[in-house]
């Protein structure tokens, strides 16, 4: 499964969707192309697996993705196609979340599984990279744009770090 994730992660940099500027994070702006490829692939793998690993509790992964993708829809609202895609995914996630959390009562419980959580992780990673590529926010965030994008995915990523350190 991890090998397939690596191939999927390589797809974005090969389509020139990669991080090429850290927007002043740690005082670094422009980075070499090879570093952008590596950073992009690592970021995608971390985000995809972070979303996948938090899918064990009913409503957690879908609820966080609703919040994350709604924020990216606002952040990327100048690009109407991206904002519409986010809105459509959020709309379907709200319905999924309802049946995932409250479906036990009526016997209509559904679950996401690996395919759903990996897809959501990839979408979140794509939106994160897209938001870091250039100033496309409704209000130009400048150097804060990197921190906004990182903050949106902080909970799932820190959970992965916590689990990795706990299992040592």
Please annotate each region the language model reported.
Residues 1-81, 91-103:
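Intramembrane alpha-helical segments
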Residues 61-168:
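Alpha-helical transmembrane segments
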């Amino acid at each position: 499964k991890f090998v397939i994730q690596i191939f999927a992660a390589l797809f974005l940099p090969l389509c020139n969707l990669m991080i090429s500027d850290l927007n002043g994070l740690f005082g670094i702006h422009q980075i070499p192309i090879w570093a952008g490829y590596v950073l992009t692939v690592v970021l995608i793998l971390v985000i995809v697996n972070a979303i996948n690993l938090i899918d064990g509790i009913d409503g957690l992964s879908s609820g966080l993705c609703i919040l994350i993708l709604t924020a990216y829809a606002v952040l990327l609202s100048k690009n109407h196609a991206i904002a519409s895609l986010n809105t459509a995914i959020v709309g379907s996630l709200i319905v999924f979340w309802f049946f995932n959390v409250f479906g036990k009562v009526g016997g209509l419980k559904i679950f996401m599984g690996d395919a759903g959580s990996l897809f959501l992780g990839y979408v979140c990673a794509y939106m994160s990279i897209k938001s870091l590529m250039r100033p496309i926010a409704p209000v130009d965030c400048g150097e804060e744009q990197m921190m906004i994008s990182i903050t949106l995915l902080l909970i799932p990523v820190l959970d992965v770090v916590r689990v990795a350190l706990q299992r040592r």
